[in-house]
Amino acid sequence: MAETAGSSGQGGGAYICFEADCSDSDTEVDSPVQCSDSSDEDLVDNANIVPGNHLELFQTQEKEAGERQISLLKRKFCLSPGTSEVEELSPGLAGIRISPPKRNPVVRRRLFDAGGRDAVRTPRDHEVNSSPEPRSQVQSGSSSRSWEGHLESINEPASDGNMAAVMHKLFKTLYIAGFGEITRVFQSDKTNNNQWVIAAHGASEVLYAASFEILSKHCSYLQASRKVHETGSMSLFLAVFNVGKSRETVRKLISGVLNTPCSRLLLQPPKIRGLCPALFWFKLGLSPATQTHGTTPDWIKQQTNVAYNTGEASKFDFGTMVQWAYDHRLTEECKIAYQYAKCAGTDLNAKAFLASTNQARLVKDCCTMVKHYLRAEEQSLTISAFIKRRCDNATGKGSWLSIMNLLKFQGIEPINFVNALKPWLKGTPKHNCIAIVGPPNSGKSLLCNTLMSFLGGKVLTFANHSSHFWLAPLTDCRVALIDDATHACWRYFDTYLRNVLDGYPVCIDRKHKSAVQLKAPPLLLTSNIDVHADEKYFYLQSRVKTFYFKEPCPASDTGEPLFFITDADWKNFFERLWERLDLSDQEDEVDEDECSQRSFTCSARNTDAMH
């Protein structure tokens, strides 16, 4: 402190101004620090307390906390009443949309909307649902529907996915196995099948009993059963109809018989491959509550047979397949695959073939082997034996007069045609080619193509002559035909293929194989060009025997030719002229015991083991 403190000469006022501590707080007296520092203050508060309802306050706070949690949980699902005020002010203004409406309604909201009957309604829910017309998202932008209509659309029984899920769940509950485990899927309702699995939900017991009698008239086999659950009943049918029916037809039939909506029906064809589906129907058929009609399908019998599922029975033998294709004379891969697959119901080896993972390679190899066997067998036959076999393969009755009448109509002496046919069949040099020449529609192709069909010959197309392999079919046939030869074709023969017309050995190139040398088979040609009348084909005239068809072939009013020749007609033709054609009689005198003793076998299994 300064020496002159308090002695400014102004009396005691200077002391007060100097020693005073300035503070602008008026609440310092009430400071809790100063109150606590006071030792004279009483620690007991004797002020009057205002009584309150603490329990009600606690409940209110708990309720608000719960509502906040529910609101956070449902914030994405609450409907907004935003358009209600606009609709009250101006309905026309409410119809105006700047942004396009959503295509699909928010399906997740339905969960909370439909559950509102049992759920606790929050004040926000009450505020939303108490609006005059809750908003509904629609594509057309029209006014929203009522709350009751919204609930009806949700709880509608015919709801597609909902009803199907309920029926599948009920089916699995009652029958243990799922409906998809015993059936396969047909995507189209138009696909025909004679076997169907039908599950009907909610059919009455009286109609179920009557339906068995009605459906048994349409089916060769029918198995029916009905089970009841607290959530509904389920009727199950395995129907094998007398004729194939589509799902649409079966649905209409069952819906009319059971008086059940189509939405409460499940229809799919049964799984016919697999042990589990077969055991399901077999076990269900043993139940006394199951009604059956007719004979059990073969696929159930076979797959529930112990011997049918043994390892030895399911072993595939390639030789058996080749033997089957050889016996049926099948040389096309598509026919071998299709026809052998159809035998899987009765042939165990065919069933094992379907279970194989390399069917394409097996079919290709089988086709190749059959072609090798048939080609070697055909080449080992004489022309007489070959024609005899073709006659045996021809079916039906025919008349050789249809061929003779066509020749006479064209002014050809039948005896001249037969005399030319005799060396042609034997492939005698200089007599190896016969040409039928004449104007269009004179029956040239009719005569030649029917003869090729009977003899199993090949047809060559000159359009492929630019390829080195266009003559490759000559290696697999006994006779051949070139239809409608033009000047280009005759010039090509005159330049390159004179020895083919002669009937001498030729070398033929084959694709992906080495060239083969063989005797040229007898050749038939049809043409509008007479090589004997043109000097530039002088070197072909001695190699070609020509017959002229000068008259147009008559036809009926419908355009059908009056001359009609079949394989049976050619069969009768060769049988009647067998000796005239100088064909040997060895086929009539052949040792029948040798032929009947054993046919050609290309399977490793013995004859008794083959199916």
From Swiss-Prot:
Name positions with the PTM Phosphoserine: S80, S84, S90
User: Any idea where the SF3 helicase domain is?
Assistant: 412-562
Query: Which Pfam families has this protein been placed in?
Result: PPV_E1_C, PPV_E1_DBD, PPV_E1_N
Write down the PROSITE patterns for this protein, in alphabetical order. Answer: SF3_HELICASE_1
Q: Its gene?
A: E1
Q: How does it assemble?
A: Can form hexamers. Interacts with E2 protein; this interaction increases E1 DNA binding specificity. Interacts with host DNA polymerase subunit POLA2. Interacts with host single stranded DNA-binding protein RPA1. Interacts with host TOP1; this interaction stimulates the enzymatic activity of TOP1.
Task: Output the GO biological process annotations, alphabetical, semicolon-separated.
Answer: DNA replication
Q: Which reaction does it catalyse?
A: Couples ATP hydrolysis with the unwinding of duplex DNA by translocating in the 3'-5' direction; ATP + H2O = ADP + phosphate + H(+)
Q: Identify this protein by name.
A: Replication protein E1
Q: List, as start-end ranges, the regions of compositional bias called Low complexity.
A: 135-146
Q: Where in the cell is it found?
A: Host nucleus
Q: What lineage, starting at the top, does this entry show? A: Viruses, Monodnaviria, Shotokuvirae, Cossaviricota, Papovaviricetes
User: Could you tell me which residues belong to the region DNA-binding region?
Assistant: 146-313
List the ranges annotated as motif Nuclear export signal.
89-98
